[in-house]
Each structure stands twice: as structure tokens, then as C-alpha cells.
Amino acid sequence: MGNQELELDELKELDEQIRYHADLFFNKNISEISDSEYDVMVNRFNELAALYPDVAEGLETTGKLVPITLDQSELKVVKFDTPMLGLKKVYTKPEVTDFVKTIKGGVVYEYKMDGLALELQYDQGKLVSAFTRGDSLEGEDVTHAIALFKPDQIPLTVSRKDRFDVRGEGYITLSDFEYYNKVSPVPAKTMRNAVSGWVRASKSNQNPLVKGLLCFGGYWASSNFGLNTYTEVIDELRTMGFGVCPRIDVNHITNDIRAEDIPVDGVVVKADSIDEHSKLGYATKVLNWAIAYKFPGITARTKLLTAVWQVGGSGAVTPVAVYAPVNILGTDNTRATLHSLKEFKDLGLTEGCDILVVRSGDCIPHIQKAYSDTGGKLLKPPRF
């Protein structure tokens, strides 16, 4: 079987696995794998989908919003007036420098929050609705979850009477997350996953322990409020009572400075001039006037426990490394999917050996290195 055939089989198998785990998590509130492992599958699916767009177009995972089922009905899904587009990701400092050179009027730097993207809609001075980002074109109505946020983060009323929308990231601080895990009979494992689950729970199933714990980091408004710069718009949002993304400087990129109590995975660099926003516009899925610099990976050494082999419905075989629990940037990890038999062989995994696990810019854990001499016999794939 050629490489293309193997990749096509893997693409179809990933489609099957993603839909299976999405249904478990969103509709049945069951997690068989960690959010990091799910991210691995989605990232690999996107890589292969870019190589084989014609095949990917016919798969259910491509471009679909998986709604959460609540009390035998789905959350209301609403189409956005303006798509909630993403940002182009860069991983090196020279890429940031090159981008800044293309921008007129200067740039601003903000932490890239790691939480749940939300849109808040205001009319006649009142908050009327809140939606998740969804698939960027359509989002889910989570207005009932506003009570989970701290009062000084999302105002219920504002002085302006015109209709406008505010977008930002819903998140929980590390200190509040630790507090929650101390008082909750069922501790949460990951901050981002927990926030998503809490906000997207039904009104009758809201977690009372979370009420007033969540924060909001605003980073966009549909109205410029007659102002000329992004800095002025964000200052206006802060004056109106919104929490906003922390403003930082280029040194946080130069020295890879992470926030101490806020979950972040990088720095967003934006054109400050509103005219530049209009001039540069956007591409198919990303804004042209902003980029996201992703912090380099954090590594942790742990011990390999075993390797298991998953066989999907299409017959594709996927090796999975199981290792002693390790926490990186607030996320507990115990498993890493190795995307191919070649990767499994190249690592040279041995029984009980030490491995180096890295959580990289996309918050995706994988095995970077195996210390083969610290283990026993070389692990070999089974015969199928």
C-alpha cells in the first residue's frame, strides 16, 4: 500500500474517531480521551484534509458544527452577522518582525487567552444574548451562562443605547481553578475544557460552584464608537465595565514571558489603526491585520507505561503511547497518539523507558524523544 493510500485511510479513520468522541463529549457528557488527545486528532485531520481537500469535503467532520444536546434538544444555533474569524499562527520571532513591518500606524500586543471564544450582543443598553464561537459562522446560544462570570467582567447594562457586539475569551484564572478543585467533589482536569463544559451546560444543569468564577477578556467590538485606534476601542470597553485582554509589549515575545495566573498560549499582534483593519480586511478564515505568536513548547520527562494499538472501522491501525501522568501548563496528560507506524519505529520505544513529552504552540502534547537506554526490550508492533 502506497503512502497516499495510507494517508487517505488515516484521514477517514480520523473522521470516524473525531465524530465518535465529539458525540460522547458534547451529547453524552462522557470523555474517553483527554482534550489534548482530541486536539491531536483534529490537528492531524486538518493536516491531511489540506492535502486531500476533495476527499475531506465528503467527510462529516469537515466544516461541521457539532451541537451539544440539552434535555433532548439542541442549543439554539445562530448565524453571526460577521464571522468570528481566526488568526494566522506564527512560531518564530522573525515572522512577527516581518508582519509588524507591513503594518502602518503601529501595532498592539495582547496575550492570547486560552479559553472559550464568545460573542456578547447588546441593544438598548442591555445584554441580550451570548454565543459561543462555534464553527466561526454559527455559534450556540449560552446566554443563560452569564451568571458564571464575575460581575466586573461582563456588564448586564451599559450606557450606550445603540446595538453592538463584543467578542472575547471566557476563561478561569489558575488560582480560581485551584480553588474550584479544592471545593468540588469532582475536580476538573483542564482549564479550557472545564470552561467550555461549564458555559455550554444547560440552564438547569449549571454548576453552582462555578457561579461568579469565570473571567472575560474582550478583544473586539462591532462598533468603533467613533474612535480611530484599537487601543481607544479597548479602553472604551474597559470604561463600560468589560474585562479585556491584558495589554503587553514586544518583550513578552522576545523573552517568551507567560502570564502567571491567566491561561495563555501566545501573544496576539494587531494593527492599532482602525483604517488598517478596513484596508487589510481578511482572508477566507483569518484576519489579515493580526497574527498570533505561539509560545514554544514546554517539555516534561516521564515514564512510558505501555503502547496500545487502536484499530478503526476502516482498518487503520494507530499506535498510542500510555505514560505516567504528567502536568504541563495546567493540563494532565497520560496518552499520546503516534500518527503512524513509522513514527512509532523512529522513536525506538523500549519497555518502561523515559520519554520527553512536549506541549507545543497548538497545545498538542506529543512524544519528542525516547530515552531507549533507560528501558528494557524494544517495543514492536503486533501482527494483525
Residue ranges and their predicted role:
Residues 1-158, 275-289:
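Phosphate/adenylate-binding "loop-and-lid" substructures adjacent to NTP/NAD/dNTP-binding pockets
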Residues 125, 309-314, 362, 372-376:
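Short, conserved beta-turn/loop elements at beta-strand boundaries and strand-helix junctions
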Residues 121, 303-306, 322, 356, ...:
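Residues located in well-ordered beta-strands
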Residues 21, 38, 87, 120, ...:
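A residue-level signal for conserved active-site and pocket-lining positions in enzyme catalytic cores
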Residues 41-51, 334-384:
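C-terminal interaction appendages of subunits in large macromolecular complexes
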Residues 153-158, 162-177, 351-366:
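Flexible glycine-rich surface loops and low-complexity tracts that mediate binding to linear polymers
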Residues 91-97, 168-170, 174-341:
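Long, charge-dense accessory insertions within large macromolecular proteins
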Residues 127-130, 268-271, 357:
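Short hydrophobic-aromatic micro-motifs
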